[in-house]
Design a protein with these regions (language model features):
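Helix-rich "cap/lid" substructures immediately adjacent to catalytic or cofactor-binding pockets
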Residues: 25-68
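Mg2+-dependent phosphoryl-transfer active-site scaffold
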Residues: 1-17, 37-38, 55-60, 67-70, ...
């Protein structure tokens, strides 16, 4: 730990007007930063979350939006301030140093399922703005409007979570890969804590019932979990469990789901609705058949 950082922090604490702080020790600061880094290391999905938060913060700053205090995840972490996720220096905002020395992560994981979790983050960031409105115009594309004084501001923000998967895999520590068999086994039991693209209760239930045997199965579940296709799950589950499907559309158990299947002229005879392709399908397409559980 850099002593210069400690001096900077203690100097800032000493300048606060409304609260008296005792000096922070190098051990206390090191412990907090270690805790946050350990939290990131515990699940690769959390590192992806930080990347997405950085992108979101950059978009907000470019639209003259100030990330203000009031929510635990964004403002009260000195580590997130140092890495640029938030521009709010928690010391200058006179937030108690006790927040630096205890975990603030319980319940703070934001599910970015199909991009909709960005909606919640945007609302947190825009706290205190007048006439704030955030809508998702299409999967992963958000239109944010708010009043800045008397001026109506508008910003469009695109964060397609699944499209970030390849970049996320390049940033995680060596030895873990989204296609490894241990991860597939965990997912087959619905153990998806910290896996931000499979966090909902319904998806956990699906994973438990479906018992995915390959990355292809995981991609299929992601693609099904969307309005217009979610009702296909019971039939696909039945076909997987019974083996009642032919060679056509084998990856999706005989029912067309993916975008490229829409180009098949025989699809008109099937009577199945195909919605917009999930980003997961596009991002994971090269890997879909490479990993099978033994």
């Amino acid at each position: 730990m850099n002593n210069k950082l400690l001096q900077t922090l203690n100097s800032a604490l000493g300048r606060t007007k409304t609260t008296h702080y005792s000096l922070v020790t190098i051990d206390a600061l090191q412990a907090r930063l270690t805790e946050e880094l350990d939290w990131l290391d515990a699940c690769p999905g959390r590192e992806c979350l930080i990347i997405l938060l950085q992108e979101l913060a950059a978009k907000m700053h470019s639209a003259r939006i100030v990330v203000n205090p009031g929510y635990s995840y964004l403002p009260d972490s000195y580590l997130l301030f140092l890495t640029g996720v938030t521009k709010v220096n928690p010391v200058e905002w006179d937030l108690p140093f006790g927040r630096f020395t205890k975990s603030v992560h319980d319940g703070a994981e934001i599910p970015f399922e199909a991009g909709t979790g960005c909606l919640e983050v945007a609302r947190k960031v825009l706290s205190g703005r007048e006439n704030e409105m955030v809508i998702e115009t299409e999967p992963g594309l958000f239109e944010i409007s708010f009043l800045d004084g008397v001026e109506l501001m508008n910003v469009k923000l695109r964060i397609t979570t699944y499209a970030e998967l390849d970049r996320f895999t390049r940033t995680i520590k060596e030895g873990w890969h989204p296609l490894d068999q241990a991860t597939l086994r965990l997912f087959s039991r619905g153990a998806t804590d910290g896996a931000i693209f499979f966090e909902s209760d319904k998806m956990r239930e699906w994973l438990f019932d479906f018992d995915p045997e390959s990355m292809s199965d995981l991609v299929l579940l992601s693609a099904l979990y969307w309005p217009g296709r979610i009702e296909l799950f019971p039939e696909i589950l039945r076909r997987k469990q019974s083996g009642d499907y032919g060679k056509e559309f084998r990856d999706t158990y005989g029912i067309p789901v993916y975008k490229e299947q829409a180009d098949d002229p025989s699809l008109a005879l099937k009577g199945h609705l195909i919605g917009r392709t999930m980003m997961a399908v596009e991002a994971l397409w090269p890997y879909r058949n490479k990993t099978k559980l033994k």
